[in-house]
């Protein structure tokens, strides 16, 4: 596990110990509606899915909130969650029966399967004390790894630079530059959603046209 993953593990473990299974427990503040909106954006990657119960890997799954939310929206998934935070994974495994959960770092974990979809909700919005250039490299590795694990597509969110205030602990990337990088380095089948009322955007990358 690299230094960034270790830093994120400590940060999110502490937040979950303080706040439990909630939006504050994953460091998204007290407004639960914002968390649900982020879930909707992640599930948007399966909007064009025709087969029943597609497989989905949730990178940085936390306490399995996305899995539980999908059930409330009548979206059937063969759901797998992976996270580096021990206390979150233990809670998810004990309380979210509809998902499968594993403790580990997606960058080094040896999976024995692929997934139709891979999503990452929140990891690439935090840099904590990591220098921006190192976080850029981490993001590139993570996005490539996610795409290598998917059969159909991936989704992830990042803080936008189109803001009038920056927090030192958050990770911001210019949406135009990130779009161009993904287009040239990952896939030409790409969508960027900058339309929703949070200071972030979601990118969707697919192997084929949708």
Label the predicted regions:
Residues 117-133:
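A short SAM/SAH-binding and catalytic strip from SAM-dependent methyltransferases
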Residues 57, 65-102:
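Class I SAM-dependent methyltransferase SAM/SAH-binding core
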Residues 1-23:
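N-terminal, positively charged/glycine-rich alpha-helical extensions of SAM-dependent methyltransferases
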Residues 150-158:
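Conserved beta-strand signature within the Rossmann-like core of class I S-adenosyl-L-methionine
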Residues 33-52:
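Conserved alpha-helix/loop element of class I SAM-dependent methyltransferases that forms part
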Residues 62:
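Conserved glycine-rich SAM-binding loop
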